[in-house]
C-alpha cells in the first residue's frame, strides 16, 4: 500500500508553480523564530493528498474498502499510542486513572438529556466506533492533546517545552490581535467551543485570569472529565462547562469578548464549520475576537507527510478533505468578521483571528 501511495504522490496531486495564491488571498505570516521549530510554508495551497487530487481519491478508495479500513483504524491507533509513549506521554496510565476515577458521577450533572446531536457527530471518529460519545475517547483525550504539541515540535526536550511553544504562540497571537483591533475592549468573558476535556479552556483561563471562561462541547463524556479536573483546581473564576451544540449554543447574543475554537474545525464538515463561525459572530460583542487554531493547509510539514502517515490520518478523520478545501478566512469574511489574519503559530498549525466590527 505504501509503495502504491508513494508512486501516486510522486506523479499525482497538485502541480508546484511558484505562486498559486490569488491576489486577494490572506497573507500568512510565520511566528518569528530560529531553528527547526520555525514554521515554514510548503509550495502548495493545501496538501496534495487532500481535496479532489488523484492521490486524495486513491487514498479515499483505500479507506472505503472496509476490511482495509479496519486494519488502518487499528494501525492508526497503535501508532498514535506508541509514538506518544515514546515521547514520555504516559498514555495508558493517564487513561486508566480517568476510567477508574469518580468521573461517572459528574456525567449526569453536566449532560443535557434533551440535546439533539448533529448527524455527523454520531459517526465513528478517531478510531472510536462511538466517536466522541464514549468514556474511552474522553479518557484518552488529554494524552492525545499532549501528543499534538509533541508532533508539532518534535525537537522539544519535553512535553512541557513543546506546550510552551505551541500554546504560547497561540495565546500570543490571540492577545496581539485583540490588543490591535478590539478598540480597547477588555477580555472579560471567554467561550471555548469544542472544548473537549478542557485543556484549551484552562490555558485561556490562565492567560486571562480576570475573565470568566465557559467551555462548551457536544460530548458529555469529555465535559465530565473537564469538570472533574476543574473541581480540583483553586481558580479565582472557575470555568463553567456547558453541554451544547457549538452551532446553536443557546447562549445570549453579544455576551463574549473572545470565542476560541482549538483543533475543532478539521473534525467538522464544511457546513458545520460555517455554522460555528456564524454562531461565534452572534455571540461576540462588537470589538470581540474569534480565534481558530488548527491544521494549516500551507504547512510544509503536513504537505510532506509520508504516504503511510497521511493515509492513517485520513482513515480516522472523515472530514479532513472538506476542511482543507474550505477557504476559512473567506468564510469568516462572508459571515461579517473583519481584520481576518492567519499566522503559522507552529510548523503544523495556523491561528486565524478576526474581529466583530463596531
Residue positions per predicted region:
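N-terminal auxiliary segments of SAM/dcSAM-dependent transferases
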Residues: 35-146
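Conserved alpha-helix/loop element of class I SAM-dependent methyltransferases that forms part
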Residues: 141-189, 203
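Class I SAM-dependent methyltransferase SAM/SAH-binding core
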Residues: 184-248, 275
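A short acidic, Gly/Pro-enriched loop at the edge of an enzyme's catalytic core
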Residues: 247-259
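A short SAM/SAH-binding and catalytic strip from SAM-dependent methyltransferases
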Residues: 257-271
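C-terminal alpha-helical "lid/dimerization" subdomain adjacent to the S-adenosyl-L-methionine
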Residues: 274, 289-345
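A short glycine-rich, Lys/Arg-flanked "PGG" loop and its adjoining helix->strand segment in the class I
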Residues: 274-286
